[in-house]
Amino acid sequence: MTTPELTAPETATLRAADGVDIDACHDPASIDPASVDVQGGSLALVVAHGFTGSWRRASLRRIASVLATTGGVVSFDFRGHGRSGGASTVGDREVLDLEAAVRWAWDLGYERVCTLGFSMGAAVAVRHAGLHHEVDAVAAVSGPSRWYYRGTTPMRRAHWVIERPLGRLVGRLALRTRISADGWDPVPEPPHEVAARISPVPLLIVHGDADRYFPLEHAEKLYAAAAEPKELWIEPGFGHAETAVPDDLLRRIAAWLATAR
């Protein structure tokens, strides 16, 4: 299936509830919305990237172009990433950033707003839905079920970047991510605990059996904790998050978000 190319997006600077500026963009649907099966009216998909990501990167623009064949797409940079202000808190105050993006989607006039998060963004999407119930459906891709996981080499490296002064310097210079030196106080509830409060909002958990960051136990724990309506998709050969997600899987996720109830 050929994916239509995106035109220049509408960009905006959003303001999170704690005053941090959030760089965001809006891509309208690239096809006639009437040709898509959508539950409840015009659809916006709000995309939450993973740690060190940015909506301006090629991987996220590809995702937006695929999703735009189903509905409008709102993308944004979490605090400490790209052109957004502030410093990354790696999944804590990022809930406020997603809240600002969701609010913008509603302000744009969409009648159905759903969130799609990858890795850290998946954890944020789960927490946002459980805390605020402001969306119609949630998809969490390659997300962790708990904090401080160090069971894989990539996650041990990630914790070095987050927790060590030299690591944060590398994060700023090489990964273009500004990371807060302050620890969590208090520690936010882990995603698997918040997942239990998402219902009645539909939750889709997607995980690859080739994920090198978080093994399948994370997806299984999230699914076990959540109440209905919920679905778990284990994808053969899929690696981790937005850089690995294939177009056909994105289309399936978008179709699920468009109709889940």
Residue locations for each model-derived region?
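N-terminal cap/lid segment of alpha/beta-hydrolase-fold proteins
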Residues: 1-37
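The serine-hydrolase catalytic nucleophile loop
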Residues: 51-64
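Conserved alpha/beta-hydrolase
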Residues: 64-85
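Alpha/beta-hydrolase active-site loop
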Residues: 89-108
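Hydrolase active-site cap/lid region
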Residues: 133-184, 201
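Short beta-strand/loop motif that positions the catalytic acidic residue
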Residues: 198-199, 205-207, 211
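Conserved alpha/beta-hydrolase "acid-adjacent" motif
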Residues: 212-218
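Catalytic histidine-centered segment of alpha/beta-hydrolase-like enzymes
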Residues: 238-248
